[in-house]
Regions:
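TRNA-binding/sensing appendages of the translation machinery
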Residues: 2-44, 114
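Acyltransferase donor/substrate-recognition loop-hinge adjacent to the catalytic core
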Residues: 1-5, 153-233
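Acyl-group handling in specialized metabolite and lipid biosynthesis
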Residues: 10, 144-150, 207-209
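An acidic- and aromatic-residue-enriched active-site/binding cleft used to recognize and process polar
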Residues: 68, 78-82, 97-99, 130-132, ...
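Acyl-donor binding region in acyl/amide transferases
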Residues: 85-167, 172, 284-366
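A conserved beta-strand-loop-helix scaffold within acyl/acetyltransferase catalytic domains
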Residues: 24-67, 75-85, 211, 215-315
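Catalytic cores of nucleotide-enabled group-transfer and carboxylate-activating enzymes in metabolic
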Residues: 14-17, 36-40, 44-48, 56-81, ...
Length: 384
């Protein structure tokens, strides 16, 4: 009952960790847009032995909110030394924030995270994030009626008031674009001109993923670490994180989903589209056993998933804000979308894109994609 007091419990041991993992399914049980995540995958996400992103965290504490006999909320507070080193600041993060529709519960959870971080002498708090901006991050601000795409967060509209009520202010917004892969033709005159320009230029080559998957992943992530290096909140992917990401994505990807753009024989751009796993697991209730894995394999490998997501897309910095760079990216992206249509995909999400990244926003809009979800990163400076 809402009249019962809230108790904040630090997570220790496996039993409480299972409760921490179970909170989202309880909170969003009546939300038609919620897609229960695979429990084994979420458990691995928290495990430093299985997730290099979690292993990079120097210090962390998970909290549960309990009202009566029920766990009604959760939050994490943590320190990411890679962020501090890269940005030359002392920052604490909050993340994994989900709670019941009660302002007191949200305030109590956020206060617990802040109190823990204050003992670590951080200058400010950023969030929400799940270990870093390279993983799920941002508070959903717009777009509550549609399901989250794979590796994107979900939430409720009242979270914004809870977070801002605790003194957090907007740091930056991130956008998710939605593309109907069979709409928006003919493309704009600019898009058509850029595509033709790339096709006429003998120094530009567009190629699909090669046979050495791990080598290709290293190529595109090298581009990513360069392309995104000046963006808000950027932390470079480490070698371990790149290998882990490749291992996680390989079982669900399709070969035609990764294309690389080369200039004078050197890789300078790429776009990577994957099936939206959340579509395939929509009714599995987070479990693959005893028969969920059969449904999952059928939907991904045989029946086909109709929705995709582009989580990674990049162009080397030296080509930013140039017609040459725009031509290369336009050709690469249109090639991926064409291959996706041939594979039976009907829609695609491109996410996330920083609100001030006009170049990437322009590329999305050239492909007739429209912004349909907004995620917000918050910050709060602490008094010294």
């Amino acid at each position: 009952m809402l009249s019962s007091p809230i108790e904040i419990i630090p997570v220790t041991g496996r039993i409480l960790l299972r409760e921490f993992l179970a909170v989202p399914d309880f909170i969003y049980a009546d939300d038609p847009a919620w897609r229960p995540q695979l429990k084994f995958e979420r458990a691995a996400h928290l495990n430093p032995q299985k997730n290099p992103g979690a292993a990079a965290i120097e210090d962390r504490q998970l909290f549960l909110a309990k009202r009566g006999a029920e766990f009604v909320g959760r939050i994490a507070a943590f320190i990411n030394p890679e962020h501090d080193t890269h940005h030359n600041e002392t920052v604490g993060f909050f993340g994994f924030f989900d709670c019941e529709a009660n302002k007191e519960t949200g305030a109590t959870l956020l206060s617990a995270a802040q109190a823990w971080l204050e003992t670590r002498k951080v200058e400010k708090i950023i969030g929400p994030a799940q270990w870093s901006t390279n993983e799920e991050c941002g508070l959903l601000i717009e777009g509550f009626t549609t399901p989250p795409a794979v590796m994107m967060p979900h939430g409720r509209a009242d979270y914004q008031g809870m977070v801002e009520g605790q003194g957090f202010v907007k740091a930056v917004d991130m956008l998710a674009y939605h593309s109907d892969l069979h709409a928006g033709f003919p493309r704009s005159k600019l898009a058509q001109a850029m595509k033709k320009s790339a096709e006429r230029n003998k120094d530009i080559a567009i190629r699909p993923m090669g046979n050495d998957f791990m080598a290709e992943v290293r190529v595109v992530m090298d581009i990513f670490n360069d392309a995104w290096s000046e963006n808000w909140g950027f932390i470079p992917f480490s070698d371990r994180q790149i290998e882990h990401m490749a291992k996680e994505i390989k079982p669900i990807m399709f070969k035609e989903g990764l294309w690389v753009g080369e200039y004078k024989g050197e890789p300078v751009a790429y776009i990577w589209m994957i099936p939206d796993l959340n579509e395939a697991i929509r009714d599995l209730k987070g479990r693959l056993f005893p028969f969920g894995w059969v449904k999952l394999l059928w939907r991904i490998k045989i029946a086909g998933v109709k929705h995709g997501r582009v989580p990674l897309m990049g162009l080397r910095r030296e080509f930013h804000n140039t017609r040459l760079g725009l031509a290369i990216v336009t050709k690469v992206s249109e090639t991926v979308f064409e291959c996706a249509r041939d594979k039976g995909f009907t829609h695609c999400e491109l996410s996330w894109i920083l609100e001030n990244n006009d170049g990437m926003k322009s590329i999305c809009e050239q492909a007739a994609a429209v912004p349909y979800k907004t995620y917000r990163m918050y910050e709060k400076r602490l008094s010294s």
